């Protein structure tokens, strides 16, 4: 079991903890498939809802909040039945807008894993307005059921009445609907190709600034992040922040980053290079490789 879960595992009921420990191996980064979730429910003699709420301390253990020191964990349950953990991330010494909220982390985890719809969000603190707006960008976002400890469950539409969302800006394919933009680039660099692929899968209906970041650690492992825009603009999730969140979920340290690549469209209304460099340089003293590509 990873050291970061030692304290949180003690907060779980013993039968659930005993069933969960084998899953918390070195490669665990917060994903539990539907079959393993069903086994946890059976072994713990708890309901699924009770298990998901009980797992929140495990999700919160993924957090990296050097500024607030407030650990927030979130669990997104997909239509597939799989669950995806996420946690808040803050960049030391940097402006607060660089922060990743736990719900954003969990949703990006699900998106990068190929999930097509979120049906439940379990979180250990009431979602802030920023996160409510971010969730509203998703497929049937208003119908996502929000679960909080010691509170009744409600749909997102309860927490965000009279919502402004993608349809108000004539966007008919919201976040998590698979969309692919093709770009022209001649490269044999595997890391650049990976970034290009993820840029094509990014979500930028308001600026067409399709973009992705890939980070590489010294052992050759790579961690990606895609741009995810929001109808309200400010809650958009930047690709560097998503990549850094992905890296920390996998229990990797910022000091291990050896290479960083940003690929973005030449036809976008904005560029993400400045924001990406600021975030990267807050945690790693390496240069950002910036590649601009033309859509086909």
Swiss-Prot record:
Zn(2+) binds at residues 101, 128, 131. This is Cytidine deaminase. The keyword Hydrolase applies. The gene is cdd. Binds 1 zinc ion. One of its GO terms (biological process) is cytidine deamination. It comes from Shewanella oneidensis (strain ATCC 700550 / JCM 31522 / CIP 106686 / LMG 19005 / NCIMB 14063 / MR-1). Residues 47-167, 186-296 form the CMP/dCMP-type deaminase domain. Its EC number is 3.5.4.5. Belongs to the cytidine and deoxycytidylate deaminase family. NCBIfam families: PRK09027.1. SUPFAM superfamilies: Cytidine deaminase-like (SSF53927). InterPro entries: APOBEC/CMP_deaminase_Zn-bd, CMP_dCMP_dom, Cyd/dCyd_deaminase_Zn-bd, Cyt/Deoxycyt_deaminase, Cytidine_deaminase-like, Cytidine_deaminase_bacteria. Substrate binds at residues 88-90. The active site is at 103 (proton donor). Homodimer.
